[in-house]
Amino acid sequence: MSTVSDTATDTLKAKTKDGSVISGGHLVAKALKAEGVDTIFTLCGGHIIDIYDGCLDEGIRIVDVRHEQTAAHAADGYARQTGKLGCVVTTAGPGCTNAVTGVATAFRSESPILHIGGQSSLSQHKM
């Protein structure tokens, strides 16, 4: 497994059939890979580091941009040009809302994109 988030001890984890532990981010990446996603468009944020780790392990390319709206528009353009699902991954809060214009554009154009928004850790919710 990758080590980008080794310092993140407060992430969702689950046990696999063989008894090993897997993070929620790795589960997301496995699901993306199973659906044929080979590229994600994103702006790096702390709430989504585990997803990056999983994507690296699954061979999913990570395209890091300078604004979440750019990531959403890039996912839209990718979907239109390749016919594949475009995937935008944003961090929690403003990261999600910054992608809304690009997601709305894709929606109105019937472009197949998926927007995954991050969430703060469970301990921040006192769970």
Task: Go through each PLM region and give its residues.
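N-terminal alpha/beta PP-like core and its mobile active-site loop of ThDP/TPP-dependent enzymes
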Residues: 2-127
